[in-house]
Amino acid sequence: MLLLLLSIIVLHVAVLVLLFVSTIVSQWIVGNGHATDLWQNCSTSSSGNVHHCFSSSPNEWLQSVQATMILSIIFSILSLFLFFCQLFTLTKGGRFYITGIFQILAGLCVMSAAAIYTVRHPEWHLNSDYSYGFAYILAWVAFPLALLSGVIYVILRKRE
């Protein structure tokens, strides 16, 4: 049981790290000396030095991506907190439904954010020299891991 709890906590922390990195790092779209993320656009030289960064445009779709990524982090943190609370207060044989629901919501939020970004980002559709960066890919990797973690929480029963 201890090994199972430890592996679930490691999976949950891995999801949290993926969510934080994908939200913070400026690598959602890269190409031609530019790097774009949810918060700013940066241009770099061939040596890798950052020359100029400016805030991303205030598009409604970008604000919805920002909001859903932040919500996914909040839901995942709440889920981890609720897991520890339920671990000590839940009766024997009880299931971690609330924890699982919050983690599944975190997964759905990150999936929504990545899907909206995929469909709506204008530079990607206009220029084939751009490609998705690693932070964008980490967001997509966090989606199935968060769903898996949430399903494990829902199935998990508390033992002594």
From Swiss-Prot:
The residues exposed to the Extracellular compartment are 32-64, 120-133
Q: Which Gene3D superfamilies match?
A: 1.20.140.150
Key words, A-Z: Cell membrane, Charcot-Marie-Tooth disease, Deafness, Dejerine-Sottas syndrome, Disease variant, Glycoprotein, Membrane, Neurodegeneration, Neuropathy, Transmembrane, Transmembrane helix, Ubl conjugation
The membrane-topology field of this record reads: Multi-pass membrane protein
Regions that span the bilayer:
2-31, 65-91, 96-119, 134-156
PTM: Ubiquitinated by the DCX(DCAF13) E3 ubiquitin ligase complex, leading to its degradation.
GO terms for biological process, alphabetical: apoptotic process; bleb assembly; cell differentiation; chemical synaptic transmission; myelin assembly; negative regulation of cell population proliferation; negative regulation of neuron projection development; peripheral nervous system development
Question: What's the impact of mutating residue 22 to F?
Answer: In HNPP and CMT1A
Superkingdom:
Eukaryota
Identify the Pfam families for this entry. PMP22_Claudin
Glycosylation (residues): 41
Q: Which PROSITE patterns match?
A: PMP22_1, PMP22_2
Q: Which residues lie on this side of the membrane: Cytoplasmic?
A: 1, 92-95, 157-160
Q: Which disease is it linked to?
A: Charcot-Marie-Tooth disease, demyelinating, type 1A: A dominant demyelinating form of Charcot-Marie-Tooth disease, a disorder of the peripheral nervous system, characterized by progressive weakness and atrophy, initially of the peroneal muscles and later of the distal muscles of the arms. Charcot-Marie-Tooth disease is classified in two main groups on the basis of electrophysiologic properties and histopathology: primary peripheral demyelinating neuropathies (designated CMT1 when they are dominantly inherited) and primary peripheral axonal neuropathies (CMT2).
Give the family per the record.
Answer: Belongs to the PMP-22/EMP/MP20 family.
Please explain the role this protein plays, according to its UniProt record.
Might be involved in growth regulation, and in myelinization in the peripheral nervous system.
Protein name in UniProt: Peripheral myelin protein 22
Instruction: Provide the species name.
Output: Homo sapiens (Human)
